[in-house]
């Protein structure tokens, strides 16, 4: 049967974008060391506490360095939460795709399968919102927000 629908294209497109986001998040998390950032903050705070009165230029510089490193640490924490969400969403969508595939194998009504695909695709709003927030990692930007026609051939 022909199961090509915009809903299936959307489902597959979201899955591919999540895979790409997951790859970027994983690479970022592998390359960023929270312990090193925490140690850097401690060292900077120690240096600042040892400054003598009247050395405001150095104090401002160290304060800014502490704030910047703190932002990097917070960004790392956000990336950890995002990676967990993306991983859960990948598992969830993969399960949905498998369930839809199993329905198709069991020769259920194409109209029923299409309605199920469309229902799953319609429930992707939160996932798509998360993907938009992760555009800085995916590099996909706004240009490919709409799902392309992924399935151009009959299944």
Regions found by a protein language model. Give the residues of each.
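Long amphipathic all-alpha helical oligomerization modules
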Residues: 51-155
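Membrane-proximal, non-transmembrane interface segments of integral membrane proteins
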Residues: 1-51
């Amino acid at each position: 049967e022909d199961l090509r629908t915009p809903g299936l294209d959307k489902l597959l497109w979201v899955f591919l974008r999540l895979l790409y986001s997951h790859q970027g998040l994983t690479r970022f998390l592998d390359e960023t060391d929270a312990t090193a950032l925490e140690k850097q903050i401690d060292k900077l705070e120690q240096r600042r506490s040892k400054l003598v009165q009247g050395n405001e230029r150095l104090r401002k510089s160290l304060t800014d360095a502490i704030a910047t490193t703190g932002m990097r640490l917070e960004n790392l924490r956000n990336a950890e939460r995002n990676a967990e969400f993306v991983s859960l969403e990948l598992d969830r969508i993969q399960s949905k795709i498998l369930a839809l595939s199993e329905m198709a194998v069991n020769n259920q009504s194409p109209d029923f399968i299409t309605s199920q695909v469309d229902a799953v695709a319609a429930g992707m709003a939160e996932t798509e919102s998360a993907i938009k927030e992760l555009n800085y990692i995916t590099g996909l930007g706004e240009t490919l927000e709409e799902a392309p026609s992924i399935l151009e051939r009959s299944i």
